[in-house]
């Protein structure tokens, strides 16, 4: 405990923090001067760099938003064009199917007409040949019947 008492009796040395001599204002001037120097050397360039980066980020975001809006417009436009192309292709396909069906029906009608014509001409030709064959056979029958009659009469 005596060491505490000795410490308490000891006087405060001079030149402390709260002495009112020229050191306190000199230290204040040094702090202000160092603040200006640090501001000029360190804080302003860093502040400029930070501002430039913020401006770059802001402009990049604005550009990205513009590009995104442009992409969305293009996507909507292309989607609409795709819808139109699909609709047009479906129309073309339907028209082509109708045309093919029409051509098929026309070809079928023509083939049936040609088959009917061939059948009719064949029937006429057969009728002509039949008539010629009957006429020829009639002549042969007449000749044979005359021959038979002559032989029968001759044998009597």
UniProtKB/Swiss-Prot annotation:
Segments passing through the bilayer: 23-43
Organism of this sequence: Paulinella chromatophora
Family: Belongs to the ATPase B chain family.
Protein name per Swiss-Prot or TrEMBL: ATP synthase subunit b', organellar chromatophore
Keyword DNA-binding applies: no
Role: F(1)F(0) ATP synthase produces ATP from ADP in the presence of a proton or sodium gradient. F-type ATPases consist of two structural domains, F(1) containing the extramembraneous catalytic core and F(0) containing the membrane proton channel, linked together by a central stalk and a peripheral stalk. During catalysis, ATP synthesis in the catalytic domain of F(1) is coupled via a rotary mechanism of the central stalk subunits to proton translocation. Component of the F(0) channel, it forms part of the peripheral stalk, linking F(1) to F(0). The b'-subunit is a diverged and duplicated form of b found in plants and photosynthetic bacteria.
UniProt KW keywords: ATP synthesis, CF(0), Hydrogen ion transport, Ion transport, Membrane, Organellar chromatophore, Plastid, Thylakoid, Transmembrane, Transmembrane helix, Transport
Miscellaneous note of the record: In plastids the F-type ATPase is also known as CF(1)CF(0).
Pfam family, one: ATP-synt_B
């Amino acid at each position: 405990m005596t060491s505490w008492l000795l410490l308490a009796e000891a006087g405060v040395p001079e030149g402390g923090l709260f002495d009112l001599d020229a050191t306190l204002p000199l230290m204040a001037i040094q702090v202000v001067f160092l603040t200006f120097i640090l501001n000029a050397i360190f804080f302003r360039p860093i502040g400029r760099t930070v501002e430039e980066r913020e401006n770059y980020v802001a402009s990049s975001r604005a550009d990205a938003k513009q590009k995104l809006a442009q992409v969305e417009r293009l996507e909507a436009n292309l989607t609409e064009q795709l819808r139109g192309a699909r609709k047009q292709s479906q129309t073309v396909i339907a028209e082509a199917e109708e045309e093919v069906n029409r051509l098929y029906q026309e070809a079928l009608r023509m083939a049936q007409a040609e088959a009917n014509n061939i059948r009719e001409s064949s029937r006429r030709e057969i009728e002509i040949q039949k008539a010629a064959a009957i006429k020829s056979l009639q002549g042969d029958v007449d000749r044979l019947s005359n021959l038979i009659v002559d032989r029968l009469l001759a044998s009597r």
